[in-house]
Each structure stands twice: as structure tokens, then as C-alpha cells.
Regions:
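Bacterial signal peptide processing site
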Residues: 18-20
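C-terminal motif of bacterial Sec signal peptides marking the signal peptidase cleavage site
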Residues: 14-16
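Short, non-transmembrane alpha-helical segments in secretory-pathway proteins
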Residues: 22-73, 77-81
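Amphipathic, interaction-prone secondary-structure segments
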Residues: 71-98
Length: 151
């Protein structure tokens, strides 16, 4: 019984410590850009795959969206076209519906944001890349899924 009580106390202490951590800040394009920068700093190997996105300045995905719709307001994106046949796209969002990962997001909503890094080949009309759940406190990827969309 004493052991059970100790385990319960430890769980409460952990929950209390985690409650003090701030939620991911996607209140502005600057905050979203900082989150993307933090991701690239924590994962420098990704910059070789998406070389232009580490310097990308994010903007609201739907600037005309009403402020009541926080899911849309908390989605930022940018794109870079290094040549006529290729486009790199970055998306940072707090909207789990956007990424189709509603269940996994419930476990990490206080700590993580969605990031999608995509490469669009205009000639092949093909979109590839990955989407991931990035923990802003531990600077760790919680989940990553590859994306491939072809005609």
C-alpha cells in the first residue's frame, strides 16, 4: 500500500510540473517562425532535404479568417520556389484536423505543434515530404509520417 501511495504522489508531482509549462505559442507569424527555426536547429539533417525552408518566414494561412476560428488562425505557411519546376512548402499549425492526427494530438496538445515540410515537383505534379508532431519543450519529434501525393 505504501508503494502504491508513493507512485500516486510521483504521478501528481509530474502532472503539476507539466502544468506549469506554457502551451505552444502560435499567436503570431513571428512565434510560428521561431517554432520552425527551433525544429531546424534541433534537426540539422533536415535542412539538407529542405534547404530553403529553414530561412522561410511564415505567414497566416488564411489572413482574412475571423479571430473566433482559432484553428485556422493558428495555421501558418510559407513556400519557396528555387527554380521553375520545384516548390518547397512549410506549414506550422496547432490544428490536428489539418494533419489528420486528432487522436495522437490529444496526448501532446500542451507540448507540440504540427509541422509539414513538403516538396512539390511541378513537372511530375507530385507532392512529397513529411508531417510531424514537434514537442516545443523537449525539441523532439513525437510522431512523423511520410507524405506522398501523386496524380
Amino acid at each position: 500500500m505504501k508503494r502504491f501511495f508513493c507512485i500516486v504522489c510521483v504521478c501528481f508531482l509530474l502532472a503539476a510540473c507539466q502544468a506549469d509549462r506554457p502551451r505552444p505559442d502560435l499567436s503570431s507569424a513571428q512565434a510560428a517562425t521561431q517554432t520552425l527555426t527551433d525544429y531546424f536547429l534541433a534537426n540539422p539533417q533536415v535542412e539538407k532535404i529542405f534547404p530553403y525552408l529553414s530561412q522561410c518566414k511564415l505567414a497566416p494561412a488564411a489572413p482574412q479568417a475571423p479571430q473566433q476560428n482559432q484553428a485556422v488562425a493558428a495555421t501558418y505557411m510559407c513556400s519557396v520556389e528555387p527554380n521553375d519546376t520545384q516548390r518547397y512548402i512549410a506549414v506550422v499549425s496547432a490544428d490536428p484536423n489539418l494533419m489528420g492526427e486528432v487522436d495522437i494530438y490529444k496526448n501532446h496538445a500542451k507540448d507540440a505543434v504540427y509541422i509539414a515540410l513538403l516538396d512539390y515537383d511541378k513537372k511530375a505534379n507530385r507532392l512529397t515530404g513529411f508531417k510531424l508532431l514537434f514537442n516545443i519543450h523537449t525539441k523532439r519529434v513525437e510522431k512523423q509520417t511520410e507524405v506522398t501525393v501523386e496524380p
